[in-house]
Amino acid sequence: TLNVEKTLNSLTREMVDIISDQLAHWATNERVVAVLIDGAGEKAFCAGGDVQALRNSSLETPGGPCDYAEHFFAREYRMNYLLHTYAKPLICWGHGVVMGGGLGILAGCRYRVVSERTRIGMPEITIALFPDVGGSWFLNQMQGHIGRFLALTSSHINAADALFCGLGSHFLSNDQKPDLLNRLIEQNWGASAEHNQDVVAVLLNDITPSGALPEAQIAPRLETINAWMSGSDLIEIYERVAAWAGDDTWLSKAQNGLLQGSPLAAAWIFKQLNQSRDASLREVFESELVLGCNIMRHPEFAEGVRALLVDKDRNPVWTYPNLLSVPNDVVDTFFVAPADMPALGLPE
């Protein structure tokens, strides 16, 4: 259980280390047949990483290396990789707010339960970060241009959308959690991880949700989303979104997410997703660490966090006023590994 309710269970470096160590221990403990990951309180599974701590690290050593932030990313991505490659069944109860690093944990689990209270998002463009924690992997798995849309607009989605785009595997009502836990205890577990994966799959498929799915937001708008996000030219995408003049409140929020987000972040998000499309999971996390470390060494991120979470004026002064003024060669520098960055150290 992620247990810092007052911060919506935001991840710190210490929490990442504890989760990683515990998962590694349980992987070889024959008495552990499956792992369920949840969050304390009713509001959130996990609202992401502690971005204020990352900002402080970025400000302490302008230009880098940013010790706390960069080692946080390295450890967090190792944890994400462990989740994705874990042999035993991993069940995530993704209730309430599931953002950023929280979504990374959810996406890494084979069984991803969402409820009527689930609110998922990757709002990184708002603070000049990027959808990391494997986002370059799972956003690229989605049909059409949904992944690109979520990354560039910071749109929030619900349980129906999560099932539609693959972030959720099962829907249960929030009040069914005790029943799920009781049923897990009663199962006929075996000695092999493969058998126990089947046990969990059959169990989850067998439980009927006690409530209704929320109204879908993505599926009925998929045609517009794909039209907005098609093509290989980010400027054209930006101009299409900016020119849209519909009366759909949800799409208007998405439009504002792109138009008000960091232009520099839009550029590196677009490039990272494109160059990761055919990458392996290992290559995804390696490239995300390079980009994450370089972002920490640039002032754009600290300004984004300042405007949203510190001064809360929601009026960031971005390095570049618009996408047209973002030089390609500047964007390219974010994808060159700094010589003094920490090693990712994924297991062979």
Write out the residue ranges for each language-model feature.
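Conserved CoA-thioester-binding segment of acyl-CoA-metabolizing enzymes
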Residues: T1-D38, Y81, P347-E348
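Hydrophobic/aromatic residues within transmembrane alpha-helices
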Residues: I37, D50, I105-L106, D161-A162, ...
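Glycine- (often His-adjacent) and acidic-residue-rich active-site loop
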Residues: G39-R78, A128, F334
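Glycine-rich beta-to-alpha active-site loop
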Residues: L83-I127, F149-S155, A159, H170
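Contiguous mid-protein beta-loop-alpha structural module that forms a pocket-lining wall or clamp
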Residues: G134-N196
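Amphipathic alpha-helical blocks and their helix-capping loop/short-beta junctions
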Residues: S173-L258
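Substrate-recognition/cap regions that form aromatic- and gly/pro-loop-enriched pockets
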Residues: I235-G246, W250-M296, E300-A302, R306
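C-terminal amphipathic alpha-helical interaction region
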Residues: L291-N294, P299, E303-E348
